[in-house]
């Protein structure tokens, strides 16, 4: 039985990584490969190892990098999950989306979800004057909490994964519903001959009782 290492975007393993162990176990039993889930504690670790992995559940940014620079093959994606943004302000501030126009907005500019937010704002004729760069989403929260920025853009999944105490540091003004970018399962090119078999197993999970239960725990209806 061939061994495969599976890695998952750290945002998706921050809480209850056991779900992904069950997912890898299911693939091992159904696809004929020993799929080993290797958890990354943070993004620097994930980014340093992802090109050596065999199977990856990657965010949109990393999906493009894996495809363009390393030849990874898209397998499938969660049918109903999209990467969206939340627009936030300081906890004690009263604000509307219109207040983002010509304002300085803290965000992580390199992440695609920032572009999702800007596209959503532009549709309403709103254009921030400048983007105040942060290296991480928590850096955006800290900039707002410390009074260095009044407005911010956050990755929705990051915000929802924050502790209740951390969420109290900001106030949500709005959230996007663009449904344009998403995480994707990517397979290393050295396993190109296994694409069809793996994809068949993954696409059939929703029609199998145990597979469907695993997907539900991952907040996925079907692949």
Regions from the PLM with identified roles:
Residues 1-9, 80-89, 167-206, 216-223:
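Periplasmic-binding protein-like
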Residues 1-64:
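Extracytoplasmic small-molecule ligand-binding "clamshell" domains
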Residues 5-26, 40, 84-141, 146, ...:
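Bilobed "Venus flytrap"/periplasmic-binding protein-like clamshell domains
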Residues 35-37, 130-131, 170-172:
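Generic structural signal for residues in well-ordered beta-strands
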Residues 43-56, 137-157:
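Short helices/loops that flank or line small-molecule/ion binding pockets
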Residues 45-99:
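Acidic, polar ligand-binding/catalytic clefts
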Residues 59-69, 143-169:
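A ligand-binding cleft/hinge motif common to bilobed small-molecule-binding domains
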Residues 110-131, 200-223:
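Ligand-binding clefts/hinges and TM-proximal coupling segments of bilobed small-molecule sensing domains
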């Amino acid at each position: 039985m061939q061994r495969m290492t599976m890695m998952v975007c750290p945002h998706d393993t921050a809480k209850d990584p056991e779900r992904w162990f069950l997912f890898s176990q299911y693939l091992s039993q159904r696809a004929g490969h020993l799929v080993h889930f290797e958890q990354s504690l943070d993004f620097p670790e994930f980014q340093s190892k992802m090109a050596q992995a065999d199977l990856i559940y990657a965010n949109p940014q990393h999906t493009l990098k894996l495809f363009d620079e390393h030849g990874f093959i898209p397998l499938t994606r969660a049918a109903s999950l999209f990467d969206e943004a939340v627009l936030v302000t300081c906890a004690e501030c009263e604000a509307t989306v219109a207040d983002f126009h010509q304002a300085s907005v803290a965000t992580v500019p390199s992440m695609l979800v920032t572009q999702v937010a800007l596209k959503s704002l532009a549709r309403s004729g709103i254009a921030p004057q400048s983007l105040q760069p942060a290296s991480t989403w928590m850096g955006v929260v800290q900039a707002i909490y410390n009074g260095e920025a009044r407005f911010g853009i956050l990755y929705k999944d990051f915000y929802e994964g924050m502790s209740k105490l951390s969420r109290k540091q900001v106030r949500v003004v709005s959230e996007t519903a663009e449904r344009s970018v998403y995480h994707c399962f990517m397979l290393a090119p050295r396993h190109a001959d296994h694409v069809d078999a793996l994809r068949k197993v993954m696409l059939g999970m929703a029609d199998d009782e145990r597979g469907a239960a695993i997907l539900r725990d991952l907040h996925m209806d079907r692949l």
